[in-house]
């Protein structure tokens, strides 16, 4: 059997780039909660003892930006300089301006356009991907790396592994078989975990705890064998972490946010952006399209691309490729997709309820992936049943 190796990585919520994503989305949530028509483009950067948020926000919401920043850092676990950042004593800089009136008139006519008339907030192209290799219809390498990262945070916060600190990275290599275009996972080849830790713990204890409390509950036994390689804190020391170890920036983890290197990516990040930004809303609707194609049995694996021009509601192009796994020709699936999904940004916002913030709705997306999550707030994960005969009508 001819097999190949494919690797996906993840970082958990204490990684400086991911901290920035979460702060940007916490700001978005707060804006949308008070004013669903908020226009938000919020970037965050961080380094030792400093967090800065900057960007363009037009909103009726009355917000305490500094409090949002500190609350988000504290919730992640950055409560002292020892762990990489002290949420209550770090410096917080805020440099937020209004959305450019040039953009506002072109995209939403200063809030006068009807939903179906709202133009894309920018040009760009976005991809959605789905594969039948996991129940989530997501790539296994990505699912395992992501779940290991989430589990790392869980055992830190519930006290199972008190030596853990917030920052950490995971990476999983899976051996695959290509079954006529569909991906079939055979085994897990390598598991890599690098996690921040305190001064009290030995490397042997780290390895033992990670195997017992993180890997064992997450990686199904059927994928592990005596040849599986484990790299557990291979650098030997990771005490300094978070923004103290590395600078962080919103939008630096777009592959972790999506499909772990599978499919394709148009380059646009998600966090801190309201739904007129097609980087986010466009990527969400094509995930729903790709997932619906696979869930409906039209293909075993699928990628969907959409593209936009600033100020124009209708997409410039829609593309479907099923990697030769389609039950009907790709051009027929494309026809079904165009009939079943409305790709206009204003309509995506309505159909996926993307103007609803609050309750950490978008904050939740900002760590452990935007796709393949079992949570009613992730409206783009709802499958639309698609029927083959639709194309023949």
Curated annotation (Swiss-Prot):
Pathway: Amino-acid biosynthesis; S-adenosyl-L-methionine biosynthesis; S-adenosyl-L-methionine from L-methionine: step 1/1. Keywords: ATP-binding, Cobalt, Cytoplasm, Magnesium, Metal-binding, Nucleotide-binding, One-carbon metabolism, Potassium, Transferase. It holds the Pfam family S-AdoMet_synt_M. ATP binds at residues 15, 167-169, 235-238, 246, 252-253, 269, 273, 277. It is an enzyme of class 2 (transferase). InterPro entries: ADOMET_SYNTHASE_CS (IPR022631), S-AdoMet_synt_C (IPR022630), S-AdoMet_synt_central (IPR022629), S-AdoMet_synt_N (IPR022628), S-AdoMet_synthetase (IPR002133), S-AdoMet_synthetase_sfam (IPR022636). It catalyses: L-methionine + ATP + H2O = S-adenosyl-L-methionine + phosphate + diphosphate. Mg(2+) binds at residue 9. L-methionine binds at residues 56, 99, 246, 277. GO terms for molecular function: ATP binding; metal ion binding; methionine adenosyltransferase activity. It comes from the Eukaryota. Its EC number is 2.5.1.6. K(+) binds at residue 43. CDD domains: S-AdoMet_synt. GO terms for cellular component: cytoplasm. Binds 2 divalent ions per subunit. The metal ions interact primarily with the substrate. Can utilize magnesium, manganese or cobalt (in vitro). GO terms for biological process: one-carbon metabolic process; S-adenosylmethionine biosynthetic process. It is found in: Cytoplasm. Its cofactor is Mn(2+); Mg(2+); Co(2+); K(+). Belongs to the AdoMet synthase family. Homotetramer. PANTHER family: S-ADENOSYLMETHIONINE SYNTHETASE. Catalyzes the formation of S-adenosylmethionine from methionine and ATP. The reaction comprises two steps that are both catalyzed by the same enzyme: formation of S-adenosylmethionine (AdoMet) and triphosphate, and subsequent hydrolysis of the triphosphate. NCBIfam families: metK (TIGR01034). This is S-adenosylmethionine synthase 4. It comes from Vitis vinifera.
């Amino acid at each position: 059997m001819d097999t190949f190796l494919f690797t996906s990585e993840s970082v958990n919520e204490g990684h400086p780039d991911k901290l920035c994503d979460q702060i940007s989305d916490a700001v978005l949530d707060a804006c949308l909660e008070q004013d669903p028509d908020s226009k938000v483009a919020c970037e965050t950067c961080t380094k030792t003892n400093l967090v800065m948020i900057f960007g363009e926000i037009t909103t009726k919401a009355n917000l305490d930006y500094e409090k949002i920043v500190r609350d988000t850092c504290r919730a992640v676990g950055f409560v002292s300089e020892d762990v990489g950042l002290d949420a209550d004593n770090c410096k917080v800089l805020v440099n937020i301006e209004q959305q450019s009136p040039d953009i506002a008139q072109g995209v939403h006519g200063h809030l006068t356009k009807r939903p179906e008339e709202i133009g894309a907030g920018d040009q760009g192209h976005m991809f959605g991907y789905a594969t039948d290799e996991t129940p989530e219809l997501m790539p296994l390498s990505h699912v395992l790396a992501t779940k290991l990262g989430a589990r790392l945070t869980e055992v830190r916060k519930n006290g199972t592994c008190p030596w853990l600190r917030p920052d950490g990275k995971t990476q999983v290599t899976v051996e695959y078989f290509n079954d006529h275009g569909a991906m079939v996972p055979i085994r897990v080849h390598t598991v890599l975990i690098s996690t921040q830790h305190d001064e009290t713990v030995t490397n042997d204890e780290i390895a033992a705890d990670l195997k017992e409390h993180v890997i064992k509950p997450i990686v199904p036994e059927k994928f592990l064998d005596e040849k599986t390689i484990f790299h557990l804190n291979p650098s030997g020391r990771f005490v300094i972490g978070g923004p103290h170890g590395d600078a962080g920036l919103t939008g630096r983890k777009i592959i972790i946010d999506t499909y772990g290197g599978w499919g394709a990516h148009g380059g646009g990040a998600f966090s801190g952006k309201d739904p007129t930004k097609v980087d986010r809303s466009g990527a969400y609707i094509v995930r729903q399209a790709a997932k619906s194609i696979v869930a409906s049995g039209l293909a075993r694996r699928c990628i969907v691309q959409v593209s936009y021009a600033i100020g124009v509601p209708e997409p410039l192009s829609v593309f479907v490729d099923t990697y030769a796994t389609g039950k009907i020709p790709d051009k027929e699936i494309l026809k079904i997709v165009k009939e079943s999904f409305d790709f206009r940004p204003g309509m995506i916002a309505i159909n996926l309820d993307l103007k609803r913030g609050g309750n950490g709705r978008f904050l939740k997306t900002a760590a452990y992936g935007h796709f393949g999550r079992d949570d009613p707030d992730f409206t783009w994960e709802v499958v639309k049943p698609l029927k083959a005969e639709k194309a023949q009508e």
